[in-house]
Amino acid sequence: MQMDERKKKILRAIVQDYISTAEPVGSRTIARKFDLGISPATIRNEMSDMEELGLIEQPHTSAGRIPSDAGYRYYVDCLLEKSSIADDVKDVIEKETTKRIAEIQTVIAHSSKLLSELTHLTSIVIGPDKGKSAFNQMHFLPYEPGKAIMVVVKENGVVENQIVEIGENVTAEELQRIANVFNHKMRGHSMEEVKRDMLHEIYSELTRQRFLIDNALELLSAVLSNSPEESSKVYLGGTLNMLNQPEFRDVEKIRNLFQIFEEGAQIIKVLHPQKEGLAVTIGGENKLKELRDCSIITGTYWIDGEPLGTIGLIGPTRMDYGKAMAMVDYMTRTLTELLTVRRRN
């Protein structure tokens, strides 16, 4: 059985009406709301065929039909028309992200909050994997006698601050020279590469400050390590938006969902960086059973061709896919542009 143009129009109408009302859709509703030029009886027959195809299904308590996961998938892949974002919404996104760009963690966290507010869905933004990034640059700030603040910027844009013992009588000029040597030798390299290939050169150029160099390298090793606690940070926004969805009025269902939200590591497992475009995972396609009533839309934000993190929206399978996909796409492109400009400056 093929999906001809008439069936496609009816399926599109069912999905759009169900997204809007959260109520099962009947043939008379379609005939009344959508100008398809066909009778309720004909619509009923076509709906029967689509039920056999597994694209729609009948809830136990209703005579109407709702889209199945397969129906949503067909809609997203074959019927969905590309949505655009209003200029005033674009202005809000650009303004709110630009004014917080000084600190990468801040802009990422705020992007999550902003995305949930604009869509009324649950947003998720995965920050840079702190453990995977190489060294970019560092500098020292005076702190107190015998100590300085070592500011380290990783290649992924994450900034780390550490207090380092520098010893007595170390001048600001000497600290600057040490930072210059580290920046020149280590930029773009992991700590493993530094230890393997560069320690001799660093010590040769900085023979007078062995105590400070040892302390700085020890702290750098911790900052650039691949330890579990240095993994990607998950920023969730609008988790309470799920409580407003009719699908999640069941207490047990929402409890299980919120437990997944609290366990960031579980969320990371189901979100994978995309080389390009968006990923849409619908209902039963999700690996976690707690997310089987949800759809997830994700995109990847980048810096100079390097994937930095993931942005996504989680909502009921009955979400407005066009709007949600447009928002995720625009947010990923905005973050990519802002973070790339920030890095180059």
UniProtKB/Swiss-Prot annotation:
> Which SUPFAM superfamilies does the entry mention?
GAF domain-like (SSF55781), Winged helix' DNA-binding domain (SSF46785)
Keyword RNA-binding among UniProt keywords:
no
Q: Does the keyword Metal-binding apply?
A: no
Molecular function via GO: DNA binding
Q: Name one GO biological process term.
A: negative regulation of DNA-templated transcription
Domain of life where this protein originates:
Bacteria
* A Pfam family annotated for this UniProt entry: HrcA_DNA-bdg
What keywords appear on the UniProt entry? Repressor, Stress response, Transcription, Transcription regulation
InterPro entries membership: GAF-like_dom_sf, HrcA, HrcA_C, WH-like_DNA-bd_sf, WH_DNA-bd_sf, WHTH_HrcA_DNA-bd, WHTH_transcript_rep_HrcA_IDD
PANTHER family, per database record: HEAT-INDUCIBLE TRANSCRIPTION REPRESSOR HRCA
For this chain, the family text in UniProt reads: Belongs to the HrcA family.
Its job: Negative regulator of class I heat shock genes (grpE-dnaK-dnaJ and groELS operons). Prevents heat-shock induction of these operons.
Protein name as annotated: Heat-inducible transcription repressor HrcA
> What is the scientific name of the source organism?
Desulfitobacterium hafniense (strain DSM 10664 / DCB-2)
